[in-house]
């Protein structure tokens, strides 16, 4: 029975990529800088003291992969862990450092074109686009129209949005059009419909924007607003068949999306969708689906919280504590890896919580592979994330993806 379980620790970079300078990210190191902060005692408090504690990830080779990436073993991690998995690090060949680019490249389809971006910090969106959306959605107007942190803008405009019914439009350094609306006063279905209209207008206008993101929130006043787990991403479809689509088309296989995976691939090559919010809930759903998974199945989970709750918010301690939670629960996944199964732990980009600004960082990603038939040891430097996709299609006996070399 052939099954692959892929866990993406969203934004978990392990050192600046060779081309990081082009992105202003020379020296970024998500894991290394978190480990440094913990070793300096910045995470010490009642019930938690000392360096970053990731024993299970270290046994899978995380520390050694990071050392291969940066030339330096992350401070405080276990140098003497017995290695039970294959480990390496991968560079990205896609033009951006965003979520779709990273995930598509993992699946064998790098983004070699340039996404469109809304670069103006204020009045970010073209007036014609805004007018068309307002008219089609019958809106009283809009708020925002700027670059913003998704949590800060709620405190700034959330109350006005609730009073006026005007949605909050904003963007970032990524190729995104984001819409924040109150779940109760505006309504979730209405927000999703608005996002569909925005996606259609962006497509018609040839803006080449990667994602429209629904950002529902609750609360009644500044300081009290919080985003809910009902986020929804409307992505464009990958430009070529991914490993997911190939498994479904060529072997009538199954691909189970947990978290935001289905949104990232625009539902192409996905046969089952499971929603879950938060690291524990994502783990629970993954365990359940791994138990149910039959032959020719990929169980594919995105752990978004590392990125959205800690990376972008530059919360070093929160990020490290989330990694420790992930590590504590990892053995529950590992014990479900049977016979021919392969478990792959990786990331889609970096988001160094010690870095300036609030955006992603251009970094190498870890590639940690575990299974009864996987030979422990170094996989070295992988020249593209697509080596993961090529390895997966080879394992399932599918036609090759266009990019990447199989790792074994």
Curated annotation (Swiss-Prot):
Required cofactor(s): Mn(2+)
Pathway this chain belongs to: Carbohydrate degradation; 2-deoxy-D-ribose 1-phosphate degradation; D-glyceraldehyde 3-phosphate and acetaldehyde from 2-deoxy-alpha-D-ribose 1-phosphate: step 1/2
Keywords, comma-separated and alphabetical: Cytoplasm, Isomerase, Manganese, Metal-binding
List of residues binding Mn(2+) 2: 307, 312, 360
Enzyme Commission numbers on file: 5.4.2.7
Similarity field: Belongs to the phosphopentomutase family.
Protein name from the UniProt record: Phosphopentomutase
Organism: Proteus mirabilis (strain HI4320)
GN (gene name): deoB
């Amino acid at each position: 029975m052939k099954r692959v379980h892929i866990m993406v620790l969203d934004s978990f970079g392990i050192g600046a990529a060779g081309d990081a300078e082009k992105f202003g990210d020379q020296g970024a190191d998500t894991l290394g800088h978190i480990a440094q902060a913990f070793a300096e005692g910045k995470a010490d408090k009642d019930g938690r003291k000392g360096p970053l504690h990731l024993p299970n990830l270290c046994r899978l080779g995380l520390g050694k992969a990071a050392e291969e990436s940066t030339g330096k073993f992350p401070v405080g991690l276990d140098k003497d862990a017995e290695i039970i998995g294959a480990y390496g690090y991968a560079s990205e060949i896609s033009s951006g450092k965003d979520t779709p680019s990273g995930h598509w490249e993992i699946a064998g389809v790098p983004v070699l074109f340039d996404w469109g971006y809304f670069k103006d910090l204020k009045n970010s969106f073209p007036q014609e686009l805004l007018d068309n959306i307002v008219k089609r959605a019958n809106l009283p107007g809009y708020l925002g129209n700027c670059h913003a942190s998704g949590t800060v803008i709620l405190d700034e405009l959330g109350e006005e949005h609730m009073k006026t019914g005007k949605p909050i439009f904003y963007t970032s350094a990524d190729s995104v059009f984001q819409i924040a609306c109150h779940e109760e006063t505006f309504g979730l279905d209405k927000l999703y419909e608005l996002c569909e209209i925005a996606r259609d207008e962006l497509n018609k206008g040839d803006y080449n924007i990667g994602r429209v993101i629904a950002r529902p929130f609750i609360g009644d006043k500044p300081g009290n607003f919080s985003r809910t787990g009902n986020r929804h991403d409307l992505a464009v479809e990958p430009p070529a068949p991914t490993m997911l689509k190939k498994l479904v088309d060529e072997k009538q296989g199954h691909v189970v999306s947990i978290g935001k995976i289905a949104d990232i691939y625009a539902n192409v090559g996905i046969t089952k969708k499971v929603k879950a919010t938060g690291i524990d809930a994502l783990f629970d759903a993954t365990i359940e689906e791994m138990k149910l998974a039959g032959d020719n199945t990929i169980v594919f989970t995105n752990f978004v919280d590392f990125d959205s709750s800690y990376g972008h918010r530059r919360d070093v301690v929160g990020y490290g504590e989330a990694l420790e939670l992930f590590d504590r629960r990892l053995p529950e996944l590992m014990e479900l890896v049977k016979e021919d199964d392969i478990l792959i732990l990786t990331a889609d980009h970096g988001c160094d919580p010690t870095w300036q600004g609030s955006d992603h960082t251009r970094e190498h990603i870890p590639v940690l592979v575990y299974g009864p038939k996987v030979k422990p040891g170094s996989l070295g430097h992988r020249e593209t994330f697509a080596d993961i996709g090529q390895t997966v299609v080879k394992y399932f006996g599918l036609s090759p993806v266009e990019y990447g070399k199989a790792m074994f």
